[in-house]
Amino acid sequence: MAHVTVISEFMYAQQVISGHHRLTADEPVSLGGGDSGPAPYELLLASLGACTSITLRMYAGRKGWELGKITVGLRYARGSDDQERIDRRMSFSKPLSPEQKARLVEIAGKTPVTKTLSRGVAIDTSVAD
């Protein structure tokens, strides 16, 4: 089970704590932040991108495929119809057959974070005593 704690002491800069890892999230200057770290949607995209490349690396390892460097570029946008979309574009430094590429696209659609985002998730919110 994943667990993260976020601490906010001043403006929009947030301390994100996950086990022994620490990072800062913030809003860009244009939104009143200090741009001291990725914005929340950038962290969401980073989660999806990391899960994608990890899953592809695991799958390729089991198949004996050499992918080389994996690059996953992601872009979030909300259309005028309020429809939210994430565009995920993957590239590999090693040559792959069209069949391998098609299979990797299929596998990317089955990563844990992809499934969570695609299904939606219930969020229970409360105030601690």
Language-model region placement:
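Extended beta-strand/beta-hairpin segments
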Residues: 1-46, 54-129
